[in-house]
Amino acid sequence: MRVPFVVYADFESFTENIDTCSPDESKSFTKQYQKHKPSGYCYLIKCFDDEIFPPMLVRQTIQKPDEDIPQMFVERLESYIKMIYNNFKFSKKVKMSLENLREHETATHCHICKGELGKDKVLDHCHITGKYRGAAHNECNLQFRIPKFFPVIFHNLSGYDSHLFIKNLGTSKGKINCIPNNEEKYISFTKQIVVDTFTNKEGKPVEVKRDIRFIDSFKFMSASLDSLVSNLSKESFKNLTSYYEGEQLQLLLRKGVFPYDWFGDFNKLIATKLPPKEAFYSRLNDTDISEEDYQHAQKVWEIFEMRTMEDYHDLYIESDVLLLADVFENFRNVCLENYGLDPAWYYTAPGLAWDAALKITKVNLELLTDYDKLLMIEKGIRGGVSMISNRYGKANNPYMEEYDPNLPTKYITYLDANNLYGWAMSKPLPTHEFRWMTEQEITGWKNHPCILEVDLEYPHHLHDLHNVPPFGHLA
């Protein structure tokens, strides 16, 4: 099922300089030279059906130096989530046309699992729109439920945006869960909020809770937003084109540029002209922007008739959110079309790929319960550097100055094999019915698909030659 509501978000920050002592360069050190204070945020609330809930773009820029932008972001986001829940908390009755009725009567396969239908055939419909979706097994229909979470997607949430507002999640009631990558970075974190209350049959008040799940699009597409945007066709920018058109749209069909290091305090917002090209220098990357990028920024300022840097700031963050929405919505469409899976249900690409593999191959993996079997398989796992090197080679070919036509023609070719793990995983792999072999089967092991643990007789004269890597795995 496509997750009905998804939020795409982004923050921008002032980069305040920090006065500090020079570090001892004879030792390893981390130098803090900037403090990032949020200057504004923007998010797009995207529904799977624009007719019942048109896209909602929310943007807030700091208006006073002491405003708490992260707190405003959290409070406003929670209020919109509560509003969405209460608008759609009651299931819509199914709307069946004559065509839908005929389709349901003649259906022979479940539209969810694609399996053959029997006596448990039921009608499946969308509880938000009331539209008929197809015939399904009763069990499939019961599991095909609207999720109890709302994904909020940032690009590079783990590395940047999460540090700006995660503390503010604790200022309101609700449990917070996280999936940590390490002490500083999180794969995802979730804030539970109360969206409604009702009185049960015993007369006791009951709270209805939903999760706001923050996930990182970088965990699915590990490239810069600029790179991801460049891979899309013009027709793919449906969210951007719903807000801009003509020359303005053409200017925004790429990632913009922003003078991060120059943008150091609240007063920069009231600047009445674009800063010079030198102001776009990045201390972090030690790079300047190109002349082409600066001309693009100047044209954006002119075409959008900007008066202050606040206008430029607002457009920059807004376009980033719309571009992210278009990139991830296209990614969702591709995954749904090819695998029938929505990435918005997942935390990372490996989790999505794992479910896609199980679904496409229809393999049921057997759980190993024999400890000895598990240990034996673990012993056979090898990894690390994989290479085959020739210590000495002499070429002889027409492209060489010292080519000898009387000798065999020889070339020295460097081969680089990529994705060895992926290649191995695409080969036939054991999945089930694991058992120990009998003595008779071991004698004729070549006739059975098997994993062998053996003792090797390794002549001493081969030890140095096969030192790295050894011919067989060492138990």
Language model: regions and residue ranges:
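Metal-dependent nucleotidyl/phosphoryl-transfer cores and adjacent nucleic-acid-binding surfaces
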Residues: M1-A475
